[in-house]
């Protein structure tokens, strides 16, 4: 058939193609043929002239270039692939790379399946040119051409629907008319676009003291802000200066500039990401639609993709893409094809187009979860953006960390996306090769916010040359353009200088505005504006197309595709997958709950329905409710950690945030309900609670419902706050209030009148009352002998009372009456707790109301509060003192002198050991499941003094592995072969004599640049070198790496600290500061840098080599200029085989000669570094010729390498070895290490403001809550119990400390592992400094908590008592710190460490003697666990200290009242008993009702609990022993468990 059935968007491919493709839906193979197109757009001409037509791209990947023949049709150059070669070419492609041509054929195959004939579309093809065809020149739609098979045509004739795939992807075709298919052709116009941000202030590093000051100043500042007064308001600073431009549909614009030029700001603001800036001026329109309307009604059509590929890591690639498709499937369905079938076909199409089909069932992963590769993860981001259906997309530095081959695949993927969908695409890239640059239509060059150029990409280079800037041979266009904006790197043409060339950003901006290209761009923009003004069809088509995509139930003004309830259902399915794919989390969750239920159930095993079991039964119910309720705290960090994905997907308009809030709660119900059910059934029946199905299910219902309420509460807290530390501080206060005012510790009638209202606002109190009433309303309590008053006390010789409760006796529990041995459970809870059975279902309604309220708040907050929108980086600086000011002034003076050519960098101070480094027959094998894998295979090589050697190869070839092996960094696997320094095996000093700049920039984030370099110099240079000399050398390194302006900036982390490029320079600087005598290893030193920064790094390495340094450096496909800087090359192919080692030669002559002698002809204009990789099959192309590894092993060059190695060894062995005492494992002594590292750790903790302030805040908050709750207790019986509960809060502190200490230690250990590899300091030093640095804060927290608790509650004022109490609190702090660090040292990850906490804390809390008194414990636990529990010593010591000699006077209502027998006084009847048990008779002479007070002093309370005042110092000593034990575990684990597998 003709092309009549294809919409206009899909025509004008630009090349007639015949190729065999597979239908992604599984249909039989069919021929795709396109007729020549009579004319070509300007875009096609540009791509053809660059040698990059779509056919060219496929042809470039073939083995035989002669298979591609050029064919010219009309005015445009076109190339045809012969039909008989297409299959061979497809077969010869590397399996995991992107082809624009092949991707379009995949698209065409699926499009063919759904395209149908229509009279109207045929009419469109033949109708005369109209205004619509003029618009098409601006939209420049896709070039995919499709044919229907005969079978499909027959179906079309039978009238089986009318559908087109592009229409489904972009808009539904409704009532086709002569104007053609409605399309979302959105051109972007920006006029006088100006962005103003915060500037003019040097922000100082926050520290512990400033965090406290901020906390108390914040309310005052907020009040001032209401009146428009802000003394700390930053000054405005232009980030982008006014600029104008147009990018038409189907065009791609490359945004270039040095770091801080404003590229990210432009990409964000051009796509309506306006958060975080002070003011944005000018106007931005999208096909005539203003930015405000676009944001409100069409938000998902204009999107920004940040450079990080942040996805849900445990979802597979297919699940991630399918979810996006489900939220964006249009309303109009394919006749006869369900929405699921459409999504299946689209998923297959995307996986095939982007060549990630092999990863469909692999999890996406992230930095912590192993998944697909970085390049494949980038393609998942592209697929997700594709699914969004957005028409304007911007991508920010998206090739960071990718090798050149993967980066080119990425650029081609964007080209494919832009062409097929007619999108408008903005991209910023670093180190863009020429192949990438050729994918773009326009380029925007920014220079400190000024536009230096905006126009056609093919004209940019000549424009800059015309200004007077000289380019270099083989220099890529992108590097040249950005280099023109760098005052240090740009070069002027002969006879030109800064006086006659636009040199400043302002001058370059002015020159551009006065240029012919700018005038042309302005005319183009005005024409497009006029078109938009005169003909609203494009705009209306866009609006109508968006409207037609919406499903039933979606408002016309909504920017979402599916309805709110559909969104909930789709997210619900995704969250279920997430939950149940987390096998480790599920298994540990079930195991934790069941084990803790077994422990608690065994402690309270089969509680008797007696008076002795009444209080412990309430304790069991309390623990059952509280444990599950507090496990919901995990919702807080998970809610905040998932914000970036939530924010991005909301920006894509996949779903409303409120839908996510509802769906995530619902998706957690099956798992949480089952976990709580198992916990409840074990706890309930082991504890001997009332045995009936109805009672159990009411218990389970309220435990689960309370959990759901608390889960909703923590989720609400998570979305209401932007900072986790703030949320954690709030949570610590609120949880403390909730636990205290549940009704278990203090009955509501006993609560202070100014705080009792908390009980009625506390969800836990309603849940606890319900399960308490459910239990006690069903049972009667029998008074056992130990609770009968008065009773026989045989050990005191008192035996005259009846064995059964008589009329003159009573039971000493709530609700009892004289002479009655049974107490109704209802009476017990009514008298003691004011709980009633009639409140059960009332409380159910209240809890449901709480849940609905928190869900409503959560939905409101998540909808209207920004969830992670403000992503911008700031630098923070150390406050400048006199010394720093002098150093910085000197650096500034020398920098100007360098620029003026008055100074040269002096490296003469470097003292290198002129010893060769060789390796022979190197093999490396690692264990894998089922066997072993060889990663390095028989590698030979050497590094001579003063040489710069490049280590290159394909991704996965073993470059980093070889570097790790040579640098002695591997700790797993088997290494074979010889690694020799100076002809001898490497010794203990090798690692400290070498420097290794790893690819990951791992640093102590709180240090400044200068401090990081100083610590490296102090610890890695010999101790005898004077400190001043080390400091001076550090200043030289700062100069060499051009870090002068950042010398006092904190390294920080992404978003709060140095940029990626600056962090990379710091990584190199830290290694150079060590003055490595032997060797310098660098792994990807230019990764993530812009072209000029990469050139600066390599240029500096050359200077080091000139001073005698030996350098081995891995690098990803450098441009020709960078490649020329290296002296020697070691090239690896996949499998860890060497394919070349030797000199590169001037202009790469030696390397080129080797390649050409072995059958790989190097084109004259090719970059040898890129070509050699393609020749060996490292890129998309299959290798040229036979196995290059075999060629190398049989080559004379290899024989020469082996001969040279032998000569180097012989020469080295002939020289005498100079014995040096400094050749020890570490450069400095243990004490010097301890002092230096302790100073750094102290600084780190001081600057980690939120970490320490959150800890202190929690202590203050808990101390204040306990004080207010138990303020100045009197000497009543109830107050006696309250004193014990107040002391029990000391056991809460370790839980808070563990939650903070463990992550802190493990994150610090990551830095230590990197530094330990360089032998900076020992593991013992690391562990001790981590411990010692925490001590001052532990002391401060202990003092704060002690003062509030001890004197607020009203404990004894005697100094001996207060001193002991304080010492125990202090030891508790230290114990918690040492325990947390010991657990962290034993754990490989933060998650594993966190799993220990519930077991430890539950065990310690249950067996300490408060919730379960020792007499009530089962024999098994009482025999060993109670005395072994560290908290037993804490509680015993504190209780005996506080209650010893404490006088007790019963208040009215606390007396046990029973009648005296006739003829006897109360003293005669019960006086001996009262004396024996430590109580007293209040009315001894009475002959009526006797008033018995069960305690006279505190001893009577704690002696039955097996606590003794005389053993309190023994308890203190045992507690100290636990601390010592923790420290020993910490030191041993730190020494032997590095938890780093390399």
UniProtKB/Swiss-Prot annotation:
It comes from the Eukaryota. It holds the Pfam family ABC2_membrane. Disulfide bonds: none annotated. Keywords: ATP-binding, Cell membrane, Glycoprotein, Membrane, Nucleotide-binding, Repeat, Transmembrane, Transmembrane helix, Transport. GO terms for molecular function: ABC-type transporter activity; ATP binding; ATP hydrolysis activity. It is found in: Cell membrane. SUPFAM superfamilies: P-loop containing nucleoside triphosphate hydrolases. SMART domains: AAA. Residues 60-69 have a biased composition (Basic and acidic residues). PROSITE patterns: ABC_TRANSPORTER_1, ABC_TRANSPORTER_2. Induction: Expression is induced in the presence of fluconazole (FLC). Glycans are attached at residues 207, 397, 822, 923. Residues 18-41 have a biased composition (Polar residues). ATP binds at residues 953-960. Major pleiotropic ABC efflux transporter that confers resistance to structurally and functionally unrelated compounds including azoles such as fluconazole (FLC), itraconazole (ITC), posaconazole (POS), and voriconazole (VRC). Is also able to efflux the eukaryote protein synthesis inhibitor cycloheximide (CHX). PANTHER family: ATP-BINDING CASSETTE TRANSPORTER. This is ABC multidrug transporter AFR1. It comes from Cryptococcus deuterogattii (strain R265) (Cryptococcus gattii VGII (strain R265)).
